[in-house]
UniProtKB/Swiss-Prot annotation:
Residues 1-34 form the signal peptide. The lineage of its organism: Viruses, Riboviria, Pararnavirae, Artverviricota, Revtraviricetes. This is Envelope glycoprotein. Glycans are attached at N43, N58. Coiled coil: none annotated. Keywords: Disulfide bond, Fusion of virus membrane with host cell membrane, Fusion of virus membrane with host membrane, Glycoprotein, Host cell membrane, Host membrane, Host-virus interaction, Membrane, Signal, Viral attachment to host cell, Viral envelope protein, Viral penetration into host cytoplasm, Virion, Virus entry into host cell. It comes from the Viruses. The gene is env.
């Protein structure tokens, strides 16, 4: 004969309620960490990285909140190319590249378009295509058809390089010459950087999550093969350590009151009158 069914001890019910409360507290903490205050100020660093070489093309730090710290970023096209665009000898007049002043100058006058890799669109290909396998994948750039997008996170446009490009007598000069190599050339710049680019965040870029880096491909628009550059944009968020309060020096133990200095007494000998 089976014994009667007994209810669970009351302590089991208490444990169940304790577990529910604990889970609720953890969930609340998790929500709090995942959704920080929009007014919290952080030390925020934006980095543009050459995905082929791993070198940084730009690193800009600023203080701000997660909703307003979206600065304009400046970098040079050759910083995301490196030596990957140095054409072979089979292409004697390529009109692009970063290894010679004239190629940098010609490249400066060439249109380009940019395609996002974070969108994961199959028809646009992968890194080997610069995420621009077919027309229509481009979302920004500097071309005659002015590519644009309502959903991508950035725009990339050409900047303006100060300085002259042609000296008297027809000789070429200016910022496309590296001053470390051509110190006597008028207007030569550090590294011969004369292909400045300006990256700005769109409204969608200000609203998206930047928990990890996002990648793009840039291609020159030219006759023949359009060379590819790959870069990423990432954000690092660091909390600001509050300054420690400065107070009076701590009182040392066994301190005695300062001793009073006793002035020596002088014996005055009266003079006879």
């Amino acid at each position: 004969m089976e014994g009667p069914t007994h209810p669970k001890p009351s302590k089991d019910k208490t444990f169940s309620w304790d577990l529910i409360i604990l889970v609720g507290v953890l969930l609340r903490l998790d929500v709090g960490m995942a959704n920080p205050s929009p007014h919290q100020v952080y030390n925020i660093t934006w980095t543009i990285t050459n995905l082929v070489t791993g070198t940084k093309a730009n690193a800009t730090s600023m203080l701000g909140t997660l909703t307003d710290a979206f600065p304009t970023l400046y970098f040079d096209l050759c910083d995301i190319i490196g030596n990957t665009w140095n054409p072979s000898g089979q292409e004697p007049f390529p009109g692009y590249g970063c290894d010679q002043p004239m190629r940098r100058w010609q490249q400066r006058n060439t249109a380009f378009y940019v395609c996002p890799g974070h969108a994961n669109r199959k028809q646009c290909g992968g890194p080997q295509d610069g995420f621009c396998a077919v027309w229509g994948c481009e979302t920004t750039g500097e071309t005659y058809w002015k590519p644009t997008s309502s959903w991508d996170y950035i725009t990339v446009k050409k900047g303006v390089t100060q300085g002259i490009y042609q000296c008297s007598g027809g000789g070429w000069c200016g910022p496309c010459y590296d001053k470390a190599v051509h110190s006597s050339t008028t207007g030569a710049s550090e590294g011969g950087r004369c292909n400045p680019l300006i990256l700005q965040f769109t409204q969608k870029g200000r609203q998206t999550s930047w928990d990890g880096p996002k990648s793009w491909g840039l291609r020159l628009y030219r006759s023949g093969y359009d060379p590819i550059a790959l870069f990423s944009v990432s954000r690092q968020v660091m909390t600001i350590t509050p300054p420690q309060a400065m107070g009076p020096d701590p009182v040392l133990p066994d301190q005695k009151p300062p001793s009073r200095t006793v002035s020596p007494q002088l014996n005055v000998i009266p003079h006879p009158s």
